[in-house]
């Protein structure tokens, strides 16, 4: 089964469990609204790619890890869009959850998706409890403080911001989780896979900064120019467009070089190359 089918099937099963017969109907429908359409599902696809490169001897556990990670990511988007943070009106081409359902339900939706992510891992633990425990730990570390997406959001409240630490926590954290969890699910050590995740995450953030500066809202599927409006730290402000484009090229080259030795190393390198082609904004593609 293709990665996309595996991810969507496991995601649908997780959401269906959260929409049980006694669930409040508005919150139940908000759960599905928050995770669909799924976009590129970049993080879970990366996780399954690493697991496959490492042999993927427990595909059910890999699927659970992929969905747990994506649920956390979707939760972070719901919370990021709230009025107290970005106050965004559009996400993935449709009204944000708080616009469609209300702010209280958006908060509950994000909270529910976070809990659901860890529940998915707990339910998958019977066959490989040690691996499952490592997966829970890896995901928790990259979700909370001091190195997770919560820390990334927290950096935006600081007067002095370390751009590298900010990017590593806000965006890199879940990419590190993706590569490490893919390895763990297949029985490999997590630590050697941190650099690959960090580099892919930084590349994604720099590319996102370039898109935010250069693309319009229709192209993005969300409001453009948000970094400038909210005075957020970003690579374009730090390096300029040309400098950010060069930085992106360097990061992507380093990502391929950082892939640890594994049976599917060549396949994974090709996946990273294809991913690079997708994330580079058209306006700067010729420069990288």
From Swiss-Prot:
Keywords: Carotenoid biosynthesis, Chlorophyll biosynthesis, Isoprene biosynthesis, Magnesium, Metal-binding, Photosynthesis, Transferase. Pfam families: polyprenyl_synt. It comes from Cereibacter sphaeroides (strain ATCC 17023 / DSM 158 / JCM 6121 / CCUG 31486 / LMG 2827 / NBRC 12203 / NCIMB 8253 / ATH 2.4.1.) (Rhodobacter sphaeroides). Disulfide bonds: none annotated. Signal peptide: none annotated. (2E,6E)-farnesyl diphosphate binds at residues 91, 170-171, 205. Catalyzes the condensation of farnesyl diphosphate (FPP) and isopentenyl diphosphate (IPP) to yield geranylgeranyl diphosphate (GGPP) needed for biosynthesis of carotenoids and diterpenes. GO terms for molecular function: geranylgeranyl diphosphate synthase activity; metal ion binding. This is Geranylgeranyl diphosphate synthase. It catalyses: isopentenyl diphosphate + (2E,6E)-farnesyl diphosphate = (2E,6E,10E)-geranylgeranyl diphosphate + diphosphate. Its EC number is 2.5.1.29. Binds 2 Mg(2+) ions per subunit. Mg(2+) 2 binds at residues 80, 86. Mg(2+) 1 binds at residues 80, 86.
């Amino acid at each position: 089964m293709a990665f996309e089918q595996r991810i969507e099937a496991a995601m649908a099963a997780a959401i269906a469990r959260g929409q049980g017969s006694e669930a409040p109907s508005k919150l139940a429908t908000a759960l599905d609204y928050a995770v669909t359409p799924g976009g590129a599902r970049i993080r879970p696809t990366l996780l399954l790619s690493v697991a496959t490169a490492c042999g993927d001897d427990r595909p059910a556990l890999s699927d659970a890890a992929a969905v747990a990670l994506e649920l956390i990511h979707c939760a972070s988007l719901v919370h990021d869009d709230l009025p107290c943070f970005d106050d965004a009106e559009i996400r993935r081409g449709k009204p944000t959850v708080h616009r469609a359902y209300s702010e209280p339900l958006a908060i509950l939706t994000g909270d529910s998706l976070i809990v659901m992510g860890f529940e998915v891992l707990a339910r998958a633990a019977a066959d490989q409890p040690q691996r499952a425990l490592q997966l829970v730990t890896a995901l928790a570390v990259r979700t909370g403080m001091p190195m997770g997406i919560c820390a990334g959001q927290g950096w935006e409240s600081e007067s002095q911001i370390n751009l590298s630490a900010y990017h590593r926590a806000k965006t890199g954290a879940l990419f590190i989780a993706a590569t490490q969890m893919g390895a763990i699910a297949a029985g490999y050590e997590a630590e050697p896979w941190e650099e690959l995740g960090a580099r892919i995450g930084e590349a994604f953030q720099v590319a996102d900064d370039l898109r935010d500066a250069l693309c319009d809202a229709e192209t993005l599927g969300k409001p453009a120019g948000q970094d400038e409006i909210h005075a957020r730290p970003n690579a374009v402000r730090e390096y300029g467009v040309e400098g950010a484009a060069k930085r992106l090229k360097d990061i992507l080259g380093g990502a391929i070089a950082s892939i640890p030795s594994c049976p599917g190393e060549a396949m994974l390198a090709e996946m990273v190359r294809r991913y690079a082609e997708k994330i580079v904004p058209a306006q700067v593609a010729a420069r990288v």
